[in-house]
Amino acid sequence: MDPGKIKMKLKRILKDLECHDAELSILITDDKHIAELNSRFLKRKGPTNVLAFPIRENDPNEPETSMLGDIVISLDAAMRDAIKTGESLTKMTDRLLIHGLLHLLGYNHERSEEAWRMEEETERLLGMMER
């Protein structure tokens, strides 16, 4: 994981999404740590591949901020997902970064229509990253 490459990719994506001054933090960790975060903050048991913690909850009364929030990725889960899908670890990590970023921007996948929209945007942004 090259932090410089990750930063460069995210800058391109944020520019494409017209989030020019946006900031976010990224933590690449393991299953144990992400499971602790998942339990503590979301009351869910076990590890997951990515967590997103938005700073704003789309409340119009909240002050405007350039900080979007935090993205946490389990490298252990990313490796398992990459093996399962046949994607490279780099592409899977890019996919999880985009997924987390879209959550920070308010995308959701609780309903099928939202899931479809989020998946479509993920694929579009992945394609842009590969160019």
Specify the residue positions occupied by each region the protein language model found.
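Periplasmic solute-binding protein
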Residues: 102
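An acidic/histidine-cluster motif and surrounding catalytic segment
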Residues: 1-94, 105-131
